[in-house]
């Protein structure tokens, strides 16, 4: 089974992955789920947390990881992605790919014969969000009816948060400047999932105070993400500051609200030092939880 986006998962499956991630966090070592299995790790862009967490996850589950960075692999350059997928499937048991285009993942999954995991692309970041869900749960947050507020650029993280929130019955509010909204496709999918379960809601707004009011979780990411290199920096610095998570914005949320950021953070831009280093910040727990969530994802794909 592939994991390209979260919308292919049912609620029970997401909850099971989180449950397994909790187990792996409490029982880090002594597993052989990936014994005699080799996992290819493809990285088209630099990575700290994703690379470390997947590499360690494979090893700590008893498997072998094969790291391939951009420039070390023919991925649509000098060889079609289809042929690369076919060849890699003869050598490895699964492919974990952090790529620039979602289409690359779709091609790897279509033409390869082994599971493909989206470790990040321009449209989605499902593994990150599974770690986020673990962080919410271990901080006593019940998913159903939880108000999750996202601030900043409508990027791959916001796309996947909408889907996760819809699956689990959250009330998700995405606060972005106009013309920086999340993907229309992901909005449509989220609304379909909300209708399917009859729970939760999705609101898009350009007013960060509306989003922050009585929120249980406040979430932000960098203002210029991997898909936004052509966006005007002067424009970003002019229209985004009101979406910064700072003490004033945080004060509008619930007293026990937590703050998340998938990192790396541009301190002083999308989030202040005071907040990211404050008692309500769970950012570094969130980063650690990438490891435990990746293990749960690997376990899941080899069981389905």
UniProtKB/Swiss-Prot annotation:
Name the pathway.
Amino-acid biosynthesis; L-arginine biosynthesis; L-arginine from L-ornithine and carbamoyl phosphate: step 1/3
UniProt: L-ornithine binding residues: 156, 221, 225-226
One annotated GO biological process: citrulline biosynthetic process
| Annotated function | Reversibly catalyzes the transfer of the carbamoyl group from carbamoyl phosphate (CP) to the N(epsilon) atom of ornithine (ORN) to produce L-citrulline.
The UniProt keyword set, sorted, is: Amino-acid biosynthesis, Arginine biosynthesis, Cytoplasm, Transferase
Write down the top EC class of this protein: transferase
Please give the family membership noted in the entry. Answer: Belongs to the aspartate/ornithine carbamoyltransferase superfamily. OTCase family.
Lineage of the organism:
Archaea, Methanobacteriati, Methanobacteriota, Methanomada group, Methanococci
Looking at the keywords, is Transmembrane helix present? no
Entry protein name: Ornithine carbamoyltransferase
Its main localization is: cytoplasm
EC number of the protein: 2.1.3.3
Matching entries from NCBIfam families are given as:
orni_carb_tr, PRK00779.1
Reactions catalysed, as given in the entry: carbamoyl phosphate + L-ornithine = L-citrulline + phosphate + H(+)
For this record, an example GO cellular component is: cytoplasm
Which source organism does the UniProt entry give?
Methanococcus maripaludis (strain C7 / ATCC BAA-1331)
- UniProt GO MF annotations: amino acid binding; ornithine carbamoyltransferase activity
PANTHER family for this protein: ORNITHINE CARBAMOYLTRANSFERASE, MITOCHONDRIAL, ORNITHINE TRANSCARBAMYLASE, MITOCHONDRIAL
Question: Which compartments is it annotated to reside in?
Answer: Cytoplasm
Which residues are listed for carbamoyl phosphate binding in this entry?
47-50, 98, 125-128, 262-263, 290
């Amino acid at each position: 089974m592939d994991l390209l986006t979260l919308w292919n998962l049912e609620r029970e499956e997401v909850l099971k992955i989180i449950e397994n991630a909790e187990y792996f966090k409490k029982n880090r070592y002594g597993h052989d789920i990936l014994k005699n299995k080799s996992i290819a790790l493809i990285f088209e862009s630099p990575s700290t947390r994703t690379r470390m967490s997947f590499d360690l996850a494979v090893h700590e589950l008893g498997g072998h990881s094969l790291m391939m960075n951009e420039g070390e692999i023919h991925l649509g350059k000098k060889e079609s992605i289809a042929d690369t997928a076919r060849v890699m499937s003869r050598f490895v048991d699964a492919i974990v790919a952090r790529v620039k285009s979602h289409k690359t993942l779709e091609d790897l999954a279509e033409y390869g014969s082994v599971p493909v995991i989206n470790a990040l692309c321009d449209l989605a970041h499902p593994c990150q969000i599974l770690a986020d869900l673990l962080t919410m749960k271990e901080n006593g947050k019940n998913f159903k009816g939880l108000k999750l507020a996202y601030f900043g650029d409508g990027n791959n993280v916001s796309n996947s948060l909408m889907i996760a929130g819809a699956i689990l019955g959250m009330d998700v509010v995405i606060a972005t400047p106009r013309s920086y909204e999340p993907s229309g496709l992901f909005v449509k999918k989220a609304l379909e999932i909300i209708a399917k379960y009859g729970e939760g809601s999705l609101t898009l707004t350009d007013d960060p105070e509306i989003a922050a009011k009585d929120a249980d979780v406040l979430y932000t990411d960098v203002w210029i993400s991997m898909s936004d290199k052509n966006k005007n920096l002067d424009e970003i610095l002019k229209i985004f500051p009101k979406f910064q998570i700072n003490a004033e914005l945080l004060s509008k949320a619930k007293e026990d609200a937590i703050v998340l950021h998938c990192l790396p953070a541009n301190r002083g831009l999308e989030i202040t030092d005071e907040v990211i280093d404050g008692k309500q910040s769970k950012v570094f727990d969130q980063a650690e939880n990438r490891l435990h969530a990746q293990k749960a994802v690997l376990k899941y794909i080899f069981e389905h």
